[in-house]
Amino acid sequence: MKIIFIAIILFILACSSVEEVNPVENADSLPKSHVNNIDKNFTVDDFVDAGWKKSKEFITDAKNENGDLLTPEAKEIWYGFFKRKDIEIRFYENHSISSTFGKESAEKAISRAVNANAGGGIITSTNNRVSYQSYVVSGNTVILCQDLLPDCILLSEKLE
C-alpha cells in the first residue's frame, strides 16, 4: 500500500506543470528606477533613523579615466546597509539636481556594474566590490540599490 501511495505522489509531482523562471531574463524586464519624495530634503541622520546602517563616506570628487567627475554636483556620498543589502546614498543640494545630475550618474553606475564582470561587481574607491542594480531618486538623494527596487523603495518610504 505504501508503494502505491508513493508512486501516486511521484506521478502527480512528475506530471505537474511548473513553469521554470529564469531570474536573469525576468530581471531585465523589471523597472530599475523609482522617484518619490520630490518636495523633501534629507540628511544622513534621516536615513539612519529609517533603519539604514551607515558604514563609510566616499569622496565626491572621484573621476573616470577621462578626468570627468563620476558624481557631479554630489555633496556627500555614503555607503551602508539596509535589510542586509549594500546601499549607497548620494546627497545633492535639492531634488532638481538629484533628478538630473544624480539620475545620470546613477544610470551610469548601474550600467557599469552590469558590464564590470560576470557577477556585475564594481570596485569602489575603498576597494569594496559592490554591484548596484537599480536606484531611487528620493528628494535630494539618489539611493543606489544592490538588488532590485523593493528594499530601496521601502527605505525611501520610511524617511520622515
Where are the model-predicted features located?
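Sec-dependent signal peptide recognition
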Residues: 1-8
